[in-house]
Amino acid sequence: MKPFIKWAGGKNSLLDEIQKRLPDFVHSQDFCLVEPFVGGGAVSLWALSDLPHLKQLVINDCNADLINVYQVIKNNPDDLIGYIENLQSHYDKLTDLESKKPYFYHKRDVFNQRTSNDIEQAGLFIFLNKSAFNGLYRVNKNNQFNVPIGNYKKPTFVDKENILNISKKLQNTKILSGDFELVLAHLPNNFPCLFYLDPPYRPISDTASFTSYSDNGFDDNEQKRLANFCKKIDKLGHYFLLSNSDPKNTNSSDEFFDELYQDFKIERIQANRTISANSNGRKKVNEIIVSNGV
């Protein structure tokens, strides 16, 4: 299985590093995985495929439109596939970008009205994700998706087999939409829990925060609240892994995360990405992985 959408900050490239740091119990006893910031779901979908002892999954995101897609994939995969295939058929008949533009912007307007049923809203979400510029999901302050059309000749909107496989695997999943702390009310009593936390990254430059994934900002105060949440997880006896940007990439004296997570293990790993829009100035960057090692 693979993520059904493109997602900025997706964790496919970090999966190897995450796997290396998983606690031993995930390979030997039944457990629950909790993702309070599920996003594109790369970690959860990998775990559902590759960790047979995963017995329950709890996923959450503050982006209600995204969570609706997960709910529809879980409950109505065939209807969703049919709706997207219909969008695909109409889009493919439009032979060039200029002819595709009116269709794209009409569907974007329909999505932003949010008056369609859940299946259609989910289908439009995936359509826009696959046809908009660079797979970005960005909304303005009024929660209006505002990414322009991308220059794709023949994008594929839906992988039927992948959606059906994900749907089967999501049947024992609790799907939530709201604040990240919401997940604590939905933990099982009979399994140990592993939390993977992938919050909106703290910007490492003034231009790095170009993307808004929801209409809720995630500033330094939110990062501090998340650190307190991690302390709460630790006191409850659960294991957590958290990923974030490393401020030291651009300011070697920035101790923000080192101070925030001083009670836990902080590791710096090389990310599979670069910073600077100038190709001559691109350089590899580090990310941090924080864990508690319960």
Curated annotation (Swiss-Prot):
Gene Ontology molecular function, alphabetical: S-adenosyl-L-methionine binding; sequence-specific DNA binding; site-specific DNA-methyltransferase (adenine-specific) activity
Keyword entries, A-Z: DNA-binding, Methyltransferase, Restriction system, S-adenosyl-L-methionine, Transferase
Keyword hit for Zinc: no
Entry superkingdom: Bacteria
Catalytic activity field: a 2'-deoxyadenosine in DNA + S-adenosyl-L-methionine = an N(6)-methyl-2'-deoxyadenosine in DNA + S-adenosyl-L-homocysteine + H(+)
EC number(s) from the headed UniProt entry: 2.1.1.72
Additional comment: The MboI restriction system has two different methylases.
Family affiliation: Belongs to the N(4)/N(6)-methyltransferase family.
Protein name, as recorded: Type II methyltransferase M1.MboI
Organism per entry: Moraxella bovis
